[in-house]
A protein has these predicted regions:
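P-loop NTPase catalytic core of nucleic-acid-dependent motor ATPases
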Residues: 1-128, 133, 137, 196, ...
């Protein structure tokens, strides 16, 4: 944030965000603080996110099975190349629950994606995040942007949308893909894949049985 000349603006912005009590939209900020947003739009969003209390999307703790292993994994340092694919053909094993758990327990580190175009995903990537989760709806694995996954692990993302930019992630991130179908094993180098197959009969939520 600017150190000189903008202190009053930022103090007013802080008071406004706290009074609002929820994450402001870009439109909200533009209408209330147009000059501040024009100069520091990304800082406005990051500052508001840091000020507000994190939202608890779910309760419980992943204690057994693939969830416990994944929770332990994202709590530590990320592998420099590996991309994790959690494959659950049956469904309802707690993949979306785990995304909510990460957002609740690691709100400043986690970003969740669905299916999207390559340029849209690249534009949305927050370089401060260290846990990237892709929650893929059933039947849409063929639209997964493998090049984005690889760029995340390489920490280098070219974003051509709007104001083109070259993003460099702060650190090597964890990357997880949750899907009901098998990934394309020819889309990436062999050493990129770690495929975790959820046994049939596992039911979602915390405390899964292995």
């Amino acid at each position: 944030l600017p150190k000189q000349g903008k202190r009053t603006d930022w103090e007013r912005y802080k008071a406004w965000v706290l009074e609002l009590g929820v994450m402001p939209t870009k439109r909200d900020i533009v209408l209330a603080f147009p000059a501040l947003y024009a100069r520091h739009y990304r800082a406005c969003l990051d500052y508001a996110e840091a000020l507000l209390p994190s939202v608890r999307l779910t309760e419980g703790t992943p204690r057994f099975g693939w969830q416990a292993n994944a929770a332990a994994d994202v709590s530590g340092a990320a592998h420099d190349r590996r991309i994790n694919f959690v494959v659950d053909p049956t469904g309802n094993s707690g993949k979306s629950w785990f995304c909510k758990w990460c957002l609740t327990n690691f709100p400043l580190e986690t970003q969740v994606f669905r299916i999207g175009k390559r340029d849209d995903l690249a534009y949305a990537i927050n370089i401060e995040k260290t846990i990237f989760l892709f929650d893929i709806p059933r039947g849409q694995i063929q639209y997964l942007q493998y090049s984005v996954l690889e760029s995340m692990k390489d920490r280098m993302i070219f974003s051509p949308k709007y104001e083109s930019s070259f993003k460099i992630l702060k650190s090597v991130p964890h990357v997880y893909v949750f899907t009901n179908e098998e990934p394309d094993m020819n889309a990436l180098s062999t050493d990129r894949y770690k495929v975790i197959r959820v046994p049939s009969g596992v039911v979602g939520g915390p405390g899964l049985t292995p």
